[in-house]
């Protein structure tokens, strides 16, 4: 999908990987970029706008744990530009001791945002199709013993996204659903993991993860923008150590008819 002239909504767009992706997107002649975030960083929004004055950048204070905030924020986008062409769900935290907050932000909020946006993008309703990219993690594909709650939330994102990425939904709506799984990236999410393990004693098995090789957020952000452009329904992409790879998950069970 060419991004030129498109309207993009980026949830959690001021995070490290997300912000790098936003900078990349601003060089693609978007019609508009809506940045939804709980953080308020006017200088960051200003810097985005300066990349390409022709693309209108909007900032919305956004609480992904509040369904009314989700509904009103997306309705505001429609009132301003009529159509959403791409939605990126990028909000996320790593704080295993707070199970409810982890699930509410990483999974439930993402689900609610997707379910609210999809009918607005549906080509058979008032939309014109497009793409939804849900940011999971490589830890949504493989277990992570020291961060079991975070891992569970990201496994949920993968399962939810793969389900909505079924051809049945794409043929009906014209909206591709893509899963993007960053590997370990040099961001505060990874750097602060030491105090956020599932249990205090999980640190014993978490130190290797905390000291493993990472990639730069600029590289991961560029990969994310590429995944948006590819608009490959049902695809799962891993961004790891500078390489973007499409992966095919194993099939362990299929219904018998």
Swiss-Prot record:
Gene3D superfamilies, alphabetized: NAD(P)-binding Rossmann-like Domain
Keyword Oxidoreductase: yes
A GO MF label: alcohol dehydrogenase (NAD+) activity
EC number: 1.1.1.1
This protein's record includes keyword Oxidoreductase: yes
Residues annotated for NAD(+) binding in this entry: 9-33
Catalytic activity annotation: a primary alcohol + NAD(+) = an aldehyde + NADH + H(+); a secondary alcohol + NAD(+) = a ketone + NADH + H(+)
EC class of the enzyme, as a word: oxidoreductase
Pfam family, one: adh_short
CDD domains: ADH_SDR_c_like (cd05323)
Catalytic site: 150
Assigned GO CC terms: cytoplasm
Residues in the signal sequence: none
Amino-acid positions noted as binding substrate in the UniProt annotation, renumbered to this chain: 137
Keyword terms of this UniProt record: NAD, Oxidoreductase
PANTHER family in alphabetical order: 15-HYDROXYPROSTAGLANDIN DEHYDROGENASE [NAD(+)], ALCOHOL DEHYDROGENASE-RELATED
Subunit structure: Homodimer.
Entry's family note: Belongs to the short-chain dehydrogenases/reductases (SDR) family.
Protein name: Alcohol dehydrogenase 1
Taxonomic source organism: Ceratitis capitata
Gene, per the UniProt record: ADH1
């Amino acid at each position: 999908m060419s991004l030129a002239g498109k309207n993009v909504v980026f949830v959690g767009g001021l995070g490290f990987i997300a912000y790098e992706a936003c900078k990349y997107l601003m060089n693609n002649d978007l019609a508009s970029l809506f940045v939804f975030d709980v953080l308020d960083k006017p200088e960051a929004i200003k810097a985005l706008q300066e990349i390409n004055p022709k693309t209108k950048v909007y900032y919305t204070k956004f609480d992904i744990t509040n369904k009314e905030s989700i509904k009103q924020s997306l309705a505001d986008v429609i009132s301003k530009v009529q159509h959403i062409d791409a939605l990126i769900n990028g909000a996320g935290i790593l704080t295993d001791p707070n199970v409810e907050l982890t699930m509410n932000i990483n999974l439930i909020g993402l689900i609610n945002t997707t379910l609210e946006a999809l009918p607005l993008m549906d080509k058979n309703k008032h939309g014109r199709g497009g793409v939804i990219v849900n940011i999971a993690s490589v830890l949504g594909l493989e277990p992570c013993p020291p961060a079991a709650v975070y891992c569970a939330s990201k496994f949920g994102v993968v399962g939810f996204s793969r389900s909505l990425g079924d051809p049945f939904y794409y043929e009906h709506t014209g909206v591709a659903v893509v899963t993007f799984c960053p590997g370990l990236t040099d961001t505060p999410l990874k750097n602060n993991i030491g105090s956020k393990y599932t249990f205090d004693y999980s640190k014993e098995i978490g130190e290797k993860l905390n000291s493993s090789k990472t990639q730069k957020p600029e590289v991961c952000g560029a990969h994310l923008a590429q995944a948006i452009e590819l608009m490959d329904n049902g695809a799962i992409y891993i961004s790891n150590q500078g390489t973007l790879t499409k992966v095919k998950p194993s099939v362990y069970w299929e219904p018998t008819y």
